[in-house]
């Protein structure tokens, strides 16, 4: 079954219930959330996440396979500042607990940045961090995200992701998030040869580890190492390639999550594109006038 959704907000008093309601308003049957603001470590206690009401709403609206995204503030690739590394490890452990409480099985993690120390040193540090953070009996997987290669990001190639996985003791607790924008920006030709890229992924990492798909177009050309998301069909990847990926038979059971930009010039009145983009990806027809329609809705 096609599980298609987007990033939604989990905030206020409604928390998980509000996230599920927002997802339902877009015609989604899955969604991704941050457990709090992605740029800080302030989090509500688990008992204030309104989980019971949220799970009831999810069940009533056929929401499943939801995904949590770890905050950007976690950088377990940092070997320069021990305090940054320790914060990352400790906060990742508490995020795993919140993810478990929410009933999610996957927590997306940007592997980390080596902050100028070189990829090998960064990867070694990430492996150490994951070995410290993972608890062998946990039922949540850390879904390492494929990165664009911006700055000193680790995880810009399938080989780097595989190197991390191979170094972790309990690597049965690791999976992968395949981000279309990041992978394109890293230099992989998902536009003309997605099957070839997926085959390469399978040989190096194993397609059975691919548990989350981030479906985003890209504002940049292939290999730009930029990581700037575009709306579906309005970037350098294009609608046809993204539609092909969303409906790929090998990835039928993988939840697909949109993280495309809100539409509009004015920050206060920007609109979420997800309802329209999800419908477009489901029915298989690209609407070149979509952005105008969203702005005028």
Swiss-Prot record:
Pfam family, one: AP_endonuc_2
Single GO MF descriptor: phosphoric diester hydrolase activity
The keyword Manganese is annotated on this UniProt entry: no
Catalyzed reactions: Endonucleolytic cleavage to 5'-phosphooligonucleotide end-products
Cofactor details (free text): Binds 3 Zn(2+) ions.
Positions that bind Zn(2+) 3: 182, 227, 229
One GO BP annotation of this record: base-excision repair
Ligand binding (Zn(2+) 2): 145, 179, 214, 259
Documented EC number(s): 3.1.21.2
Listed NCBIfam families: nfo, PRK01060.1-1
Record protein name field: Probable endonuclease 4
Species, as recorded: Listeria monocytogenes serotype 4b (strain F2365)
Name of the gene: nfo
